[in-house]
Swiss-Prot record:
Signal peptide: none annotated. The lineage of its organism: Viruses, Viruses incertae sedis, Naldaviricetes, Lefavirales, Baculoviridae. It comes from the Viruses. GO terms for molecular function: DNA binding; DNA-directed RNA polymerase activity. GO terms for biological process: viral genome replication. Required for late and very late gene expression. This is Late expression factor 1. It comes from Orgyia pseudotsugata multicapsid polyhedrosis virus (OpMNPV). Belongs to the baculoviridae LEF-1 family. InterPro entries: DNA_primase_LEF1. Coiled coil: none annotated. SUPFAM superfamilies: Prim-pol domain (SSF56747).
Length: 243
């Protein structure tokens, strides 16, 4: 039997990050691998950990609420990266673009997680405008806000738009903001995950067998980068403009 991929501490972090954790069904990938769907709820992180150990669990996914609905989760993947450094650069740029877009909106971002494979998951707070039971039409409206255009014209980018935020994020990490670079680093949001509230989603801090890594929180480091770059601009640094 392979060693357990989880510690009690990691399961506790995962448990604490799941809303309605004691009345929410979970789905599991075993080491074999195959999917297992637990029929009962878990009362505590300790009970969940015991289940994970007993069943040789690898991945943990959160299902929608019993009455329907699920958190708004922006799932963005970056394919064809040359190495881990390029992947994490694209993850940081893409996630930062969303942080900039939602900047000043306290009811928006809950957390941003590296998925453990090739992208990130941004969880939006469901106590504000992004309610769990929101209609699919509203989710699709927001998806279109984040959808990558076929081409960009710098003069047509409106301040505060998502395109503007991607451009600012690209400049923040690369020091350039040409249209081709903005399109290259534009985060590709999974429409199915974002728009369909009946889809299960990876639990924060869980293991990802595809990537061989754990989901981890990026929120604080992204906030620090934005703060540092903003201070640099105020001190006379170069603002994010296109070249």
């Amino acid at each position: 039997m392979a060693p357990c991929k989880y510690t009690p501490e990691r399961v506790q972090m995962m448990w604490d990050a799941i809303a309605y954790n004691d009345s929410r069904r979970l789905a599991f990938m075993t080491d074999r691998p195959r999917w297992v769907h637990a029929h009962n709820f878990f009362d505590s992180a300790a009970q969940l950990f015991a289940y994970i150990v007993k069943n040789s669990i690898s991945d943990v996914h959160v299902k929608p609420l019993e009455e329907g609905g699920r958190e708004w989760v922006i799932d963005a993947d970056f394919k064809d990266c040359a190495d881990k450094a390029e992947l994490m650069l694209k993850v940081n740029v893409g996630a930062t673009a969303f942080m900039l877009f939602f900047e000043g909106k306290e009811d928006a971002v809950q957390r941003i997680m590296f998925s453990g494979n090739r992208g990130f998951h941004l969880w939006l707070k469901f106590c504000g405008k992004f309610k769990m039971d929101a209609p699919k039409s509203l989710r699709e409206h927001w998806f279109n806000v984040f959808k990558q255009p076929a081409k960009l014209v710098s003069g047509d980018i409106r301040p505060g738009s998502f395109a503007d935020c991607v451009r600012r994020a690209v400049h923040m990490y690369i020091g350039d903001a040409r249209e081709d670079l903005v399109l290259r680093y534009w985060p590709d949001v999974d429409r199915d995950v974002f728009c369909n509230a009946n889809k299960q989603i990876r639990a924060p801090f869980s293991y990802n067998y595809k990537g061989g890594d754990y989901s981890r929180c990026l929120t604080q480091q992204l906030q620090q980068r934005i703060k540092a770059c903003s201070a640099g601009c105020l001190a006379g640094g170069t603002p994010p403009t296109s070249k």
